[in-house]
Amino acid sequence: MSSLSNQQVDLQLEELPGWQRDGNAIVKTYHFSDFVEAMSFMNQAAFHAEALEHHPEWSNAYNVVEVRLTTGDTGGITSHDVRLAKRMEHIVQPKCL
Protein backbone atom coordinates (compact mmCIF):
# COMPACT_ATOMS: atom_id res chain seq x y z
CA MET A 1 0.00 0.00 0.00
CA SER A 2 1.26 3.46 -0.83
CA SER A 3 0.34 6.92 0.41
CA LEU A 4 -2.19 8.96 -1.51
CA SER A 5 -0.94 11.95 -3.46
CA ASN A 6 -1.75 15.44 -2.17
CA GLN A 7 -4.32 15.81 -4.95
CA GLN A 8 -5.96 12.48 -4.04
CA VAL A 9 -6.14 13.47 -0.38
CA ASP A 10 -7.67 16.83 -1.27
CA LEU A 11 -10.33 15.13 -3.41
CA GLN A 12 -11.21 12.73 -0.61
CA LEU A 13 -11.40 15.53 1.96
CA GLU A 14 -14.05 17.25 -0.16
CA GLU A 15 -16.32 14.32 0.71
CA LEU A 16 -15.45 14.37 4.42
CA PRO A 17 -16.93 17.48 6.07
CA GLY A 18 -14.84 18.85 8.90
CA TRP A 19 -11.81 16.66 8.17
CA GLN A 20 -8.53 18.44 7.53
CA ARG A 21 -5.01 17.48 6.62
CA ASP A 22 -2.48 17.85 9.43
CA GLY A 23 0.95 16.88 8.13
CA ASN A 24 0.87 13.19 7.27
CA ALA A 25 -2.59 12.63 8.77
CA ILE A 26 -6.22 13.61 8.46
CA VAL A 27 -7.89 14.94 11.60
CA LYS A 28 -11.30 15.90 12.92
CA THR A 29 -12.77 17.00 16.24
CA TYR A 30 -16.27 15.73 16.98
CA HIS A 31 -18.57 17.42 19.50
CA PHE A 32 -21.40 15.39 21.00
CA SER A 33 -24.26 16.26 23.33
CA ASP A 34 -22.69 14.44 26.27
CA PHE A 35 -20.11 11.90 27.40
CA VAL A 36 -22.36 8.91 26.70
CA GLU A 37 -22.81 9.94 23.06
CA ALA A 38 -19.06 10.44 22.68
CA MET A 39 -18.35 7.00 24.13
CA SER A 40 -21.03 5.41 21.97
CA PHE A 41 -19.35 6.86 18.88
CA MET A 42 -15.93 5.62 19.98
CA ASN A 43 -17.26 2.14 20.70
CA GLN A 44 -18.95 1.87 17.31
CA ALA A 45 -15.91 3.27 15.52
CA ALA A 46 -13.68 0.77 17.34
CA PHE A 47 -15.58 -2.13 15.76
CA HIS A 48 -15.11 -0.59 12.30
CA ALA A 49 -11.43 0.03 12.99
CA GLU A 50 -10.96 -3.56 14.07
CA ALA A 51 -12.79 -4.89 10.99
CA LEU A 52 -10.56 -2.74 8.76
CA GLU A 53 -7.46 -3.63 10.80
CA HIS A 54 -6.71 0.09 10.90
CA HIS A 55 -6.74 1.88 14.23
CA PRO A 56 -7.09 5.59 14.95
CA GLU A 57 -5.13 7.82 17.24
CA TRP A 58 -7.84 9.48 19.29
CA SER A 59 -8.67 11.11 22.57
CA ASN A 60 -11.80 11.94 24.52
CA ALA A 61 -12.61 14.72 26.97
CA TYR A 62 -16.23 14.61 28.13
CA ASN A 63 -18.26 15.26 24.95
CA VAL A 64 -15.33 15.88 22.58
CA VAL A 65 -13.52 13.23 20.54
CA GLU A 66 -10.39 14.17 18.60
CA VAL A 67 -9.43 11.76 15.81
CA ARG A 68 -6.16 11.50 13.88
CA LEU A 69 -5.80 8.98 11.04
CA THR A 70 -2.52 8.09 9.39
CA THR A 71 -0.85 4.94 8.12
CA GLY A 72 2.41 4.36 9.95
CA ASP A 73 3.71 1.81 7.46
CA THR A 74 3.74 4.39 4.67
CA GLY A 75 4.30 7.50 6.76
CA GLY A 76 1.32 9.14 5.10
CA ILE A 77 -2.38 9.12 4.33
CA THR A 78 -3.74 6.04 2.56
CA SER A 79 -7.09 4.70 1.42
CA HIS A 80 -7.35 2.94 4.80
CA ASP A 81 -7.45 6.32 6.55
CA VAL A 82 -10.10 7.64 4.18
CA ARG A 83 -12.19 4.47 4.49
CA LEU A 84 -12.19 4.66 8.30
CA ALA A 85 -13.01 8.39 8.23
CA LYS A 86 -16.00 7.67 5.97
CA ARG A 87 -17.22 4.97 8.34
CA MET A 88 -16.90 7.39 11.26
CA GLU A 89 -18.95 9.94 9.35
CA HIS A 90 -21.63 7.34 8.73
CA ILE A 91 -21.80 6.57 12.47
CA VAL A 92 -21.93 10.18 13.58
CA GLN A 93 -24.41 11.78 11.17
CA PRO A 94 -27.44 11.83 13.48
CA LYS A 95 -25.45 12.33 16.72
CA CYS A 96 -22.89 15.06 16.21
CA LEU A 97 -23.66 18.69 17.09
From Swiss-Prot:
It comes from the Bacteria. One of its GO terms (molecular function) is 4-alpha-hydroxytetrahydrobiopterin dehydratase activity. It catalyses: (4aS,6R)-4a-hydroxy-L-erythro-5,6,7,8-tetrahydrobiopterin = (6R)-L-erythro-6,7-dihydrobiopterin + H2O. It holds the Pfam family Pterin_4a. One of its GO terms (biological process) is tetrahydrobiopterin biosynthetic process. Keywords: Lyase. Its EC number is 4.2.1.96. The keyword Phosphoprotein does not apply. The keyword Lyase applies. NCBIfam families: PRK00823.1-2 (NF002017), PRK00823.1-3 (NF002018). HAMAP family: Pterin_4_alpha. PANTHER family: PTERIN-4-ALPHA-CARBINOLAMINE DEHYDRATASE. Belongs to the pterin-4-alpha-carbinolamine dehydratase family. This is Putative pterin-4-alpha-carbinolamine dehydratase. It comes from Psychrobacter arcticus (strain DSM 17307 / VKM B-2377 / 273-4). The lineage of its organism: Bacteria, Pseudomonadati, Pseudomonadota, Gammaproteobacteria, Moraxellales.
